[in-house]
C-alpha cells in the first residue's frame, strides 16, 4: 500500500516535507510583490503575508477626482494580492514532488 520502505519511509518523507514547507513559508513571508493599475500610475507593494508595504501614486493623479484614485489604489492592491498568491502556489508546487504518495492521496494545499 505504501510502496517500498513502508510506513516508516512515508513518515520520514512527511517530516522532510514539513521541514521544507516551514522554510518555504518563511521565504514566502519575506517576499515583496508590486501590483499596478492605471498603466503603472498607482503601485502597491505587499509582502507574502498580504501586508501593504508601500503605495506609490503618480503626481498627475493628485489633480484628478478622489473616487478614481481610490479605485486605482484598490485595483493595484488586488493585482498585488493576485501576484503574491500565484508566487506562493508556484513555490509550494515543488514541495511534494519527490514524495512517493499512495495513489489518490491529496495534500492539504
From Swiss-Prot:
Keywords: Cytoplasm, DNA-binding
GO molecular-function terms, A-Z: DNA binding
Location of the region described as Disordered in the Swiss-Prot/TrEMBL record: 1-23, 89-109
InterPro entries: YbaB-like_sf, YbaB/EbfC
Single GO cellular component term: cytosol
Superkingdom per UniProt: Bacteria
Keyword Metal-binding carried by entry: no
Gene3D superfamilies: Nucleoid-associated protein YbaB-like domain (3.30.1310.10)
Cellular localization per UniProt: Cytoplasm, Nucleoid
UniProt main location, coarse: cytoplasm
SS bond list: none
A Pfam family matched in the record: YbaB_DNA_bd
Quaternary structure annotation from Swiss-Prot or TrEMBL: Homodimer.
Family to which the UniProt record says this protein belongs: Belongs to the YbaB/EbfC family.
Purpose: Binds to DNA and alters its conformation. May be involved in regulation of gene expression, nucleoid organization and DNA protection.
Matches recorded under HAMAP family: DNA_YbaB_EbfC
Protein name: Nucleoid-associated protein plu3840
Organism, as annotated: Photorhabdus laumondii subsp. laumondii (strain DSM 15139 / CIP 105565 / TT01)
Amino acid at each position: 500500500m505504501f510502496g517500498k520502505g513502508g510506513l516508516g519511509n512515508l513518515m520520514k518523507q512527511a517530516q522532510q516535507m514539513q521541514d521544507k514547507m516551514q522554510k518555504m513559508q518563511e521565504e514566502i513571508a519575506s517576499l515583496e510583490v508590486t501590483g499596478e493599475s492605471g498603466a503603472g500610475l498607482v503601485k502597491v507593494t505587499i509582502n507574502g503575508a498580504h501586508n501593504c508595504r508601500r503605495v506609490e501614486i503618480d503626481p498627475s493623479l493628485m489633480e484628478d477626482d478622489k473616487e478614481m484614485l481610490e479605485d486605482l489604489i484598490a485595483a493595484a492592491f488586488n493585482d498585488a494580492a493576485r501576484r503574491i498568491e500565484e508566487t506562493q502556489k508556484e513555490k509550494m508546487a515543488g514541495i511534494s514532488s519527490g514524495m512517493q504518495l499512495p495513489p489518490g492521496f491529496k495534500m492539504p494545499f
